[in-house]
């Protein structure tokens, strides 16, 4: 485009920045093109395949001539039923598959659909600090006011409810929570979820729990919807990306009361045209996996976690060994200027990419995150490189 063009982007485009990983991975790609062979421990994208039966189902259904057309906006009945069975079996939550479940093209899109369904320009949204950056960026796109609430190490990375009660809550429509937490690894508990639901009910705030990590290095999967009456004011998003190694398949869902689901569908049905039927039928198969699937998955992650802990220790970082999920979160040494400079020094000095915590908010500034989504062999090589770093 010529520099003197009078065409400008919408104001909302000026409100958000390019996603950190989108920009940083370009830098990593440039380094790789120069032959630096960067080991990436940054992204939480599982490197292992789904169960073989899931892949077989995808291929078998894709070979049929009648499975390539548009599909229902609400997903296949069999998929909604499989999600309901999954919630009943693993979380002890009863859901009406016809009215209380909406499949998503990955749970990330649900952040947009939920925000557009509930938030008007000028409304306020409670967003955790540190937290997933998309909660804030989507709120900005919706022209909402962002109210960040603190998560701090001294409070176990849980909300300070006394502090929350002192915040200006009269215009708050949504509160984003994410337990088991990313990036901190703080676990979900029924006590925590009860407090969150009580807070939402007290202030007429819709609570949204983003719950993709509950099966990773976690013996007790818990759902916010397990709290009595939670469905009245709460929505939970879930995903097969991490729990079933299906990140690129974009298979997610949300669950809530029938009215909330209907409102969200009004938005969603005007944005996309459903999901690929072979992928949905394969997801049904994935959701039927028994406990041995999760046990084998976690056996692999447990071994990688040991190496991640060794890397953190070598870097002089401190960390909580009780963390859940797909990452390890650690506090950088006091002498380091910032998490960004610390991570860049490792990137250029050891050719290992880890995530600086500042991207998750100001409360993440003194922290870094290591992903478990690299082979144990690669992680051991990363450890070796860091040991040799000057």
Indicate where each model-derived feature is located:
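Helix C-cap/helix->beta junction micro-motif
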Residues: 34, 142, 202-203, 315, ...
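Conserved glycine-rich beta-strand-loop-beta hairpin in the small C-terminal domain of fold type I
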Residues: 284, 300-309, 319-331, 364
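N-terminal small-domain helix-loop-helix segment of the aminotransferase-like
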Residues: 2-106, 113, 286-289, 390
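Active-site phosphate-binding strand-loop segment of PLP-dependent enzymes
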Residues: 151-219
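Conserved core segment of the aminotransferase class I/II
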Residues: 229-302, 306-315, 389-390
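PLP-dependent enzyme catalytic core of the Aspartate aminotransferase-like
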Residues: 85, 165, 336, 345-355, ...
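Conserved PLP-anchoring active-site segment centered on the Schiff-base-forming lysine
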Residues: 117-139
């Amino acid at each position: 485009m010529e520099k003197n063009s009078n065409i400008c982007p919408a104001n909302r485009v000026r409100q958000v920045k390019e996603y950190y990983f989108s920009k940083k991975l370009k830098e990593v790609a440039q380094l790789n093109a120069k032959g630096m062979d960067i080991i990436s421990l940054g992204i939480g994208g599982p490197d292992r395949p789904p169960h073989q039966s899931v892949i077989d189902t995808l291929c078998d259904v894709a070979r049929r001539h009648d499975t390539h057309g548009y599909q229902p906006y609400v997903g296949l009945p069999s998929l909604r039923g499989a999600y309901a069975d999954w919630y009943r079996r693993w979380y002890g939550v009863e859901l009406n598959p016809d009215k209380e479940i909406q499949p998503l093209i990955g749970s990330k899109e649900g952040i947009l659909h939920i925000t557009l369904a509930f938030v008007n320009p000028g409304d306020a949204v409670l967003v955790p600090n540190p937290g997933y950056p998309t909660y804030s960026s989507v709120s900005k796109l919706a022209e909402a006011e962002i109210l960040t609430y603190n998560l701090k190490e001294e409070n176990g990375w849980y909300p300070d409810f006394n502090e929350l009660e002192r915040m200006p809550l009269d215009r708050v429509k949504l509160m984003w929570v994410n337990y088991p937490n990313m990036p901190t690894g703080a676990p979900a508990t029924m006590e925590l979820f009860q407090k969150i639901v009580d807070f939402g009910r007290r202030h007429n705030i819709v609570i949204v729990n983003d719950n993709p990590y509950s099966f990773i290095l976690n013996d007790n999967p818990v759902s916010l919807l397990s709290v009595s009456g939670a469905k009245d004011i709460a929505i939970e998003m879930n995903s097969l990306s991490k729990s079933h190694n299906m990140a690129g398949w974009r298979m997610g869902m949300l669950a809530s009361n029938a009215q909330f689901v209907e409102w969200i569908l009004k938005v969603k049905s005007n944005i996309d045209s459903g999901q690929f039927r072979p992928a949905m039928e394969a997801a049904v198969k994935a959701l039927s996996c028994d406990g041995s699937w999760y046990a084998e998955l976690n056996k692999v992650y447990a071994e990688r976690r040991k190496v991640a802990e060794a890397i953190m220790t070598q870097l002089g970082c401190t960390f909580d060994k009780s963390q859940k999920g797909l990452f390890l979160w650690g506090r950088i040494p006091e002498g380091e200027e910032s998490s960004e400079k610390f991570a860049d020094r490792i990137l250029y000095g050891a050719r290992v990419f880890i995530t600086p915590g500042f991207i998750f908010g100001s409360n993440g500034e003194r922290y870094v995150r290591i992903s478990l989504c690299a082979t144990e062999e690669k992680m051991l090589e990363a450890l070796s490189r860091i040991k040799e770093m000057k």
